[in-house]
Amino acid sequence: MAEVDISHSKKKKQDKTENDAADTGDYMIKPQSFTPAIDTSQWPILLKNYDRLNVRTGHYTPISAGHSPLKRPLQEYIRYGVINLDKPANPSSHEVVAWIKRILRVEKTGHSGTLDPKVTGNLIVCIDRATRLVKSQQGAGKEYVCVARLHSAVPDVAKVARALESLTGAVFQRPPLISAVKRQLRIRTIYESKLLEYDADRHLVVFWVSCEAGTYIRTMCVHLGLLLGVGGHMQELRRVRSGILGENNNMVTMHDVMDAQFVYDNSRDESYLRRVIMPLEMILTSYKRLVVKDSAVNAICYGAKLMIPGLLRFENDIDVGTEVVLMTTKGEAIAVGIAEMTTSVMATCDHGVVAKIKRVVMDRDTYPRKWGLGPRASMKKKLIADGKLDKHGKPNEKTPVEWSRNVVLPTGGDAIIAGAAAAPEEIKADAENGEAGEARKRKHDDSSDSPAPVTTKKSKTKEVEGEEAEEKVKSSKKKKKKDKEEEKEEEAGSEKKEKKKKKDKKEEVIEEVASPKSEKKKKKKSKDTEAAVDAEDESAAEKSEKKKKKKDKKKKNKDSEDDEE
């Protein structure tokens, strides 16, 4: 028996050692020449396929603030939540949304697009912070299943299918008679339509349609009847998709919402409520993603643009003007933005704006502030505290010269700024020369007292050389000034000579003999000359002409009087 027990124990030991070896073999770090890929296909919501994103940098400091969308505390989870609701028939969309607001005891609710009271189906209800995404959901495409009744029989099913197919593309529509909007003609796009079923006996047509937001299916049914030549109207309608959420994406009823809140109130069980409400990130999964560093998150929440240093990862095929979602490393949506760079520029550029913000989703101060911590900002805070800058950080009387030189620049473009920046350097150079001259004088005085004659000679020669250089510079400047003054005087003299010549020409023209033909020529010549002369000279010439004419008239009058006598 003892031998049997010993053999049993040996077998057990062998089995254990084999299992341990297998385990160690599984968990040993294998030598590899490449980084093993992480399978992120099962990661939640915005983090799905995270490894396929382009990496700008992997260096950032993780901050413990914020929560993964599915692991937020319940109250925060509800505030950042959306419900894919199956709207019941008869109550209006606004009534349904108001009931949910009252059931969940929240501040705000919104929906993805109004459904008529009799229409059922998909209605995305946004709660509190998620209401900021309502506009984007209202403009998203929609899908419907409709039952239309034709006013008389159409025997050929193919004819119905052709008529339905012709109602695709851009279509003119006027809102129905019973509608809450102004009945203006508008253009809406119908992307696709399929005939699902046709009952010739009851004249019923069942079809599926994918269309632009704001399309009236009731009007489409009337148009279908007109195309078939029998008339028709809408019998029933159900929305099966709104944006990216459809009937199969966790659609719940009003009863589910009420029951989930009741279960939580009575048994503190969150699971049902978390199943009914989804994180708002669910409706942003169709957007291109930009992953932001934790230190840049709060700045974006305050409205700052996303710059290159704050970017961690980015998606392929981003163009300028593309709508993108800015997300944290935990998978939270920060904001919806508009890209200012393409994917290739993001990969190569080291500065600039990546995206500007369209709508901020995240609350401010969810993450700590991480701007204003650099040396420049801390210096500014210190100056404000000491009263050397005003409370807005603007210079006052006590502001140090160094700070104001760096901060306050004249307006008027780069040229003026460059000139202003260059001017102080010349002044500095003159000041330095002056200081150097004073230092030389001091050295000279000191050297005269000192007994070493060699050093004094050197200093004297240096001073003499410096003075000669200064005199040369001054003399060259004076020469330049004199040359400029002489040039100006020469130009002024030449202008005076030209004016005198013009006056002489005018006088010669005026002194010509007055005859009817010569007077006309004289006027033409005077006009040509007057065009080239200043306004003052013109007035003088006109006065002299008038005087001469008066004299001529007087002479003629005298001659006529003499003839009469």
Swiss-Prot record:
GO cellular component annotations of the record: cytosol; nucleolus; plasmodesma; ribonucleoprotein complex
Biased composition (Basic residues): 546-557
Claim: Cell division is one of the keywords in the record: no
Enzyme category, top tier: isomerase
Chief place of localization: nucleus
Reaction equation(s) it catalyzes: a uridine in RNA = a pseudouridine in RNA
Single Gene Ontology MF annotation: pseudouridine synthase activity
Disulfide bonds listed in the record: none
InterPro entries linked to this entry: Dyskerin-like, PsdUridine_synth_cat_dom_sf, PsdUridine_synth_N, PUA, PUA-like_sf, PUA_sf, tRNA_PsdUridine_synth_B_fam, TruB_C
Modified residues (Phosphoserine): S450, S515, S539
Active site: D116
Any one GO biological process: rRNA processing
Location of region: Disordered: 1-28, 433-565
Top-level taxon: Eukaryota
The entry's keywords: Isomerase, Nucleus, Phosphoprotein, Ribonucleoprotein, Ribosome biogenesis, RNA-binding, rRNA processing
Compartments, as annotated in UniProt: Nucleus, Nucleolus
Domain PUA stretches: 287-362
PANTHER family: CENTROMERE/MICROTUBULE BINDING PROTEIN CBF5, H_ACA RIBONUCLEOPROTEIN COMPLEX SUBUNIT DKC1
Family classification: Belongs to the pseudouridine synthase TruB family.
Quaternary data: Component of the small nucleolar ribonucleoprotein particle containing H/ACA-type snoRNAs (H/ACA snoRNPs). Component of the telomerase holoenzyme complex at least composed of TERT, CBF5, POT1a and a telomerase RNA template component TER1. Interacts with POT1a.
Stated role: Plays a central role in ribosomal RNA processing. Probable catalytic subunit of H/ACA small nucleolar ribonucleoprotein (H/ACA snoRNP) complex, which catalyzes pseudouridylation of rRNA. This involves the isomerization of uridine such that the ribose is subsequently attached to C5, instead of the normal N1. Pseudouridine ('psi') residues may serve to stabilize the conformation of rRNAs.
Protein name listed in UniProt: H/ACA ribonucleoprotein complex subunit 4
Organism: Arabidopsis thaliana
